Amino acid sequence: MKIAEIHVYAHDLPVKDGPYTIASSTVWSLQTTLVKIVADSGLAGWGETCPVGPTYAPSHALGARAALAEMAPGLIGANPLQPLVLRRRMDGLLCGHNYAKAAIDIAAYDLMGKHYGVRVADLLGGVAAERVPSYYATGIGQPDEIARIAAEKVAEGFPRLQIKIGGRPVEIDIETVRKVWERIRGTGTRLAVDGNRSLPSRDALRLSRECPEIPFVLEQPCNTLEEIAAIRGRVQHGIYLDESGEDLSTVIRAAGQGLCDGFGMKLTRIGGLQQMAAFRDICEARALPHSCDDAWGGDIIAAACTHIGATVQPRLNEGVWVAQPYIAQPYDEENGIRIAGGHIDLPKGPGLGITPDESLFGPPVASFS
C-alpha cells in the first residue's frame, strides 16, 4: 500500500461559552488543521493538529500548514502501514515541527486500523480500559467562581481537576487553590495546579509553602526545565512537566535524572501516536503517572488521545483531556468523542472510529498527489 494523496484542511473552532483563559493567552476561537491521507487502495485516514494560538508553545496554525506543505510531496508513495518508517521519512524531509508530523502520523494510524479492521488502541499495544478517565481544566478565574466550577465538575464525575494559575498576583492563586480544596476535600478527586510556565520560582515556592496540607501536584510551574530543577527539592508537592516535555530525549533526561514526578503530555507536541506509545512505555518503566492530552482540536485529535489513553496502565493514568466541552459542532454526530460522567468511552469502529462530515471543512487549502 502507498500514499496516493494528501489533503490539508483549515477549520475554525469557536470556543463555546468562551473565552478559555490560561496564563499566556485568552482564546475565543482557534483554527485547526486536518489532514486526509488517501492510499492507492482508496482507503483514507484522518489526522489533526490544533495549537492553542501562537504563544502557548512554539507552534501555530500557519506553521503547521507550512510544515505539511514542505513534507507532503516527499510522502507520496510512502507506506502508511509502517508508522515508524513513515516517521523517519518525515524526519528526513523536515527538522523538528513535531506538531505537524503528528497529524500525518495520526492519519496513518487511522488508515492502518481501517485496513486491518482493528481499533488504533489495539495497534498501540492493546486496551487496558474501555472507559477512559478524563479530567477537567478550569481556566483562570476568580477564586469563588473557580471553586464553584470545581465542585460542579466533581459532582459530574470527573476523577481529577486541573486548576489553572499564573499571570496575576500569586496571592490570588493561593486563595483559589485553598477555596477549591475547601469545596472538594473528602471527595477523593485528584488535584493538579497548572502554571503553564508562568510562575517565577519565587512564586512557585511560595504557593507550595503556603498550601502544604493540600495534596496537589504542581504542573509546569516555571518556564524552563532548569528553573524547575532548581526548585525541585524545595517544594512541598510533586512536580509534573508539561510544556518542557518537548520530545522523547527530554522525557528520558527528566525521568532518568528525577526532575519530575509525572507528565502532562500533549500528543502532537511529542510527534504523534508512534512517539506517544514510546513515551507511555518510558513512563511505565519508571512508574511515572501521566496524562494523554492535546492542546486543542476536534473529534479526530480527541479520538487519538482517547485511543492512546486507553492503553495506559490504569494506576499511572492521569486521564485524557479533550476540548469537546468547548466545541459546539462535532465532526461526527454519531460517533464523536463525548465526556460522560467524567469519562470517555473508547470508540468502537476500526481506526480512530470517527467518520468526519467533510462538508464541515470546505475545500482543502492544499492537496498533493
UniProtKB/Swiss-Prot annotation:
CDD domains: enolase_like (cd00308)
Disruption phenotype: Cells lacking this gene grow more slowly than wild-type on tHyp-B as sole carbon source, whereas growth is normal on cHyp-B. When both hpbD and hypF are disrupted, P.denitrificans is unable to utilize tHyp-B or tHyp as sole carbon source.
Family annotation (InterPro entries): 4R-hPro_betaine_2-epimerase, DgoD-like, Enolase-like_C_sf, Enolase-like_N, Enolase_C-like, Mandelate_racemase_C, Mandelate_racemase_N_dom
EC number assigned by the record: 5.1.1.22
Active site: K164 (proton donor/acceptor), K266 (proton donor/acceptor)
Chain positions recorded as substrate binding sites: Y56, Q162, A295
An example molecular function term from Gene Ontology annotations: amino-acid racemase activity
Signal sequence extent: none
GO biological process terms, semicolon-separated: amino-acid betaine catabolic process
Cofactor: Mg(2+)
Disulfide bonds: none
Reaction catalysis annotation: trans-4-hydroxy-L-proline betaine = cis-4-hydroxy-D-proline betaine; L-proline betaine = D-proline betaine
SUPFAM superfamilies found in the cross-reference section: Enolase C-terminal domain-like, Enolase N-terminal domain-like
Keywords annotated in UniProt: Isomerase, Magnesium, Metal-binding
Induction or repression: Up-regulated by tHyp-B and cHyp-B. Repressed by high salt concentration.
Function: Catalyzes the 2-epimerization of trans-4-hydroxy-L-proline betaine (tHyp-B) to cis-4-hydroxy-D-proline betaine (cHyp-B). Is involved in a catabolic pathway that degrades tHyp-B to alpha-ketoglutarate. This pathway would permit the utilization of tHyp-B as a carbon and nitrogen source in the absence of osmotic stress, since tHyp-B functions as an osmolyte and is not catabolized when it is needed as osmoprotectant. Can also catalyze the racemization of L-proline betaine.
PANTHER family per record: D-GALACTONATE DEHYDRATASE-RELATED, ENOLASE SUPERFAMILY MEMBER DDB_G0284701
Family: Belongs to the mandelate racemase/muconate lactonizing enzyme family.
UniProt-recorded name of the protein: 4-hydroxyproline betaine 2-epimerase
Organism annotation: Paracoccus denitrificans (strain Pd 1222)
